[in-house]
Amino acid sequence: GPGTKTPPGQLLVLGDEYMQKKAVSLQKVLLVRSVLTMAIADALTAVLDSKYTYFVRRPFMMDPSLITIMPTPNHPSYPAGHSTLSTAGATVLKYYFPEDKDMWEAKAYEAGMSRIWGGIHYMMDHEAGVIMGGKVGQA
C-alpha cells in the first residue's frame, strides 16, 4: 500500500506527490488513482500467473556462490515483478500526464533494473516485465 517500499506503494506515493505538486483537481486525482490502482492489481495478477507458469529459478538459485545485495523473494524470477508493475504504473501515469512521460519511463526503468543490479533477476526477466507491464497499462 501507500508508503511501503513495494512497487505498488511507491507508485501510489509517486503519483500522489506528483498530483499534489501539480495541483491536480480532486476529480482527476480520483480518476488517476483508481486507474493506477487497477493497473497495479492487474499487473500483479499477470506477473504471478506467469511466474508460476514458467517457473524460472533466480540467479542465486542457479549459482549458490552468488551473493545478493538485497533480500531475495521466495518466488520464481520470470518475469520481473518490479519491472511489470512499474511499467504498468508508468504507462498509466504517462497517459494522464504526457508532459512528463520521460520521467515516468525513467522511474520504471530504474525500478526494474535495480533488481538486476541487486543480483536477483536476469535481464530477460526485466525485458519481459517491461513488455507485460506496458500491455497491462494500456488495457
Please state what every model-predicted region is.
Residues 1-139:
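Hydrophobic alpha-helical bundle signature of multipass membrane enzymes
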